[in-house]
A protein has these predicted regions:
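Alpha-helix N-capping/helix-start residues
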Residues: 13-14, 54, 100
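Conserved nucleotide-cofactor-binding alpha/beta core module
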Residues: 65-124
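Short secondary-structure transition/capping segments
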Residues: 27, 41, 106-108
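Alpha-helix boundary/capping detector
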Residues: 27, 32, 46-47, 86-87, ...
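Conserved alpha-helix/loop element of class I SAM-dependent methyltransferases that forms part
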Residues: 3, 7, 32, 37-40, ...
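Short hydrophobic/aromatic-rich motifs at helix boundaries and adjacent loops
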Residues: 29-34, 76-80
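N-terminal auxiliary segments of SAM/dcSAM-dependent transferases
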Residues: 1-32
Length: 124
């Protein structure tokens, strides 16, 4: 994924590439769509929400350039994958999701990925 999809889109930051390498995207993809975990498509996650394409997630993470001493507010937890990438950077992440079903599945995936430097809230 990194060599064929991410680098060609100008994502070259070593911290971003390390995060993408370390955080298993497939953990955050619903079981029925795991075969598409690394495809350049939006993946439905329920509640009429989708995961972004991997290249867009990578470009967003590179543009944000999170630092270890930052506190980050993420509005819209979704699958939890971006939450995990932000947390991997060492930042303290607070994530808020309106849909209880999504916060529940994201919490499971984040726990499975051993991501702990975050707080999750359900709300609008």
């Amino acid at each position: 994924m990194i060599e064929q999809q991410i680098r060609p889109w100008g994502v070259l930051d070593s911290d971003v590439l390390a995060a993408l390498q370390s955080v298993g995207r497939e953990t955050f993809v619903p079981p029925d769509y795991r075969h598409l975990a690394f495809a350049d498509v939006e993946i439905p996650i329920g509640q009429a929400q989708t995961m972004m394409e991997p290249k867009l997630e990578a470009r967003l993470l590179q543009a944000l350039a999170p630092k270890t001493d930052e506190n980050i507010l993420e509005v819209g937890t979704g699958s939890g994958y971006m939450t995990a990438l932000l947390s991997h950077a060492g930042a303290n992440v607070t994530t808020v999701e309106i849909f209880p079903e999504l916060i529940s599945s994201a919490a499971e995936a984040l726990a499975a990925a051993s991501i702990s430097n975050l707080s999750m809230e359900q709300g609008d």
